[in-house]
Amino acid sequence: MNSLSPELALSRISPELRPLLCSIVRNGRVGLDSSSCLRITDLKSGCTSLMPGPCCDRFKLHIPYAGETLKWDIIFNARDPELPPDFIFGEDADFLPEPSELPNLVSWDSGKPECLLLLVKEMLQQYHQYQCQRLRDSSRLLFEYDSLLEDPNYGRNMEIYAGRKNSWTGEFSARFLLKLPVDFSNIPIYLLKDTALDPGEDVALLSVSFEDAEATQVFPKLYLSPSIEHALGGSSALHIPAFPSGGCLIDYVPQVCQLLTNKVQYVIQGYHKRREYIAAFLSHFGMGVVEYDAVGFTKLTLLLMWKDFCFLVHVDLPLYFPRDQPTLTFQSIYHFTSSGQLYSQVQKSYPYSPRWDGNEMAKRAKAYFKSFIPQFQEGAFANGKL
């Protein structure tokens, strides 16, 4: 397989066919996984070597589907570019689309740049039905599919890849890929800013692999688009439960949806609670506030004085605040460590309750500062250097 950049691949395509391929490689997002694009490889030509200029008119199309990559050969005729292409469906030799149900094949228009992309999408719809029919080899997996199909939350956003045989046991197996109906629209935009180049929509996909027809070995895995994974605290922030022995997808999938929805709500709530917290500190400490994060409300620095001893307090508010307690870092402005850093002490355990409002937290923090400063000052003089 020769992997080429999209632009280099296009440069080798016959000019008459190039607009059709442009739509494929530049706008080719199909199916549930909007982060994966269609790719073309193995460019070849059916023309004689005497034909001038770029004349590739056949290639292999890589299509993301249900966690697999389908590889279909698409064959044009550069000498008669107005004709529709032929398709070879790789390992799915028994997949035979019904031509009359492919409008963009019946009314093929080589002058319409998106015609090939639309035809591929129509074929994928038939391919989905083909895979669903293969589930009939397993009554248990067919039950899983029918149960999901009856629920409008899942039935319209599901891909199936079925009928793979385990080379050791000969068992039938299948994979379900579902787009979870979780609302990400209210996640604070600043959490998504570092993924501005993230392709596709914000989405959560649940892949569930059945390694045998009786569902004794089931392996779920959650995939989040990069922006959502970043917003929720990284790949390690969310662990989905194992698929229960004897369980069913129609019971398991809503549990994962609820888990993810709760996580999103924690993040949204944390943003508003952090904003409330910092507003309360601005009110209580006034001119003592040196700086604060006015976008995500994740940091706050105070300059305070106790008996002519000046010090800084850095407050770091976690993503899942108020469930998780803020970290306080006390820092002397006079004393240095042996490594040349300002002497500091980190406090992660102090009077705190996630049920307090921002005003109560600010009042309690002020009281804690007063009680802790003598100890901090003593440590600064004993361990720091002026």
Swiss-Prot record:
Keyword Nucleus assigned: yes
Q: Which GO terms describe its cellular component?
A: BRCA1-A complex; BRISC complex; cytoplasm; nucleus
Q: Where in the cell is it found?
A: Cytoplasm; Nucleus
Q: Which domain of life is it from?
A: Eukaryota
Q: Name one GO biological process term.
A: mitotic G2 DNA damage checkpoint signaling
Output the Gene Ontology terms for molecular function: polyubiquitin modification-dependent protein binding
Residues spanning the signal sequence: none
Query: Is Cell membrane among the key words of this record?
Result: no
Keyword annotations of the record: Apoptosis, Cell cycle, Cell division, Chromatin regulator, Cytoplasm, DNA damage, DNA repair, Mitosis, Nucleus, Repeat, Ubl conjugation pathway
Q: Name one Pfam family in it.
A: BRE
Xref: CDD domains:
BRE
Q: Which InterPro entries match?
A: BRE (IPR010358)
Q: Where is this region: UEV-like 1?
A: 33-150
Which parts of the sequence are annotated with region: UEV-like 2? 278-367
Disulfide bridge map? none
PANTHER family referenced in this protein's UniProt entry, alphabetically: BRISC AND BRCA1-A COMPLEX MEMBER 2
What note about domains is in the entry? Contains 2 ubiquitin-conjugating enzyme family-like (UEV-like) regions. These regions lack the critical Cys residues required for ubiquitination but retain the ability to bind ubiquitin.
The Swiss-Prot or TrEMBL record describes its family as follows: Belongs to the BABAM2 family.
What does this protein do, in the record's words?
Answer: Component of the BRCA1-A complex, a complex that specifically recognizes 'Lys-63'-linked ubiquitinated histones H2A and H2AX at DNA lesion sites. The BRCA1-A complex also possesses deubiquitinase activity that specifically removes 'Lys-63'-linked ubiquitin on histones H2A and H2AX. In the BRCA1-A complex, it acts as an adapter that bridges the interaction between babam1/nba1 and the rest of the complex, thereby being required for the complex integrity. Component of the BRISC complex, a multiprotein complex that specifically cleaves 'Lys-63'-linked ubiquitin in various substrates.
Describe the subunit structure.
Component of the ARISC complex, at least composed of uimc1/rap80, abraxas1, brcc3/brcc36, BABAM2 and babam1/nba1. Component of the BRCA1-A complex, at least composed of bard1, uimc1/rap80, abraxas1, brcc3/brcc36, BABAM2 and babam1/nba1. In the BRCA1-A complex, interacts directly with abraxas1, brcc3/brcc36 and babam1/nba1. Binds polyubiquitin. Component of the BRISC complex, at least composed of abraxas2, brcc3/brcc36, babam2 and babam1/nba1.
The protein in question is named: BRISC and BRCA1-A complex member 2
Provide the organism lineage as a comma list.
Answer: Eukaryota, Metazoa, Chordata, Craniata, Vertebrata
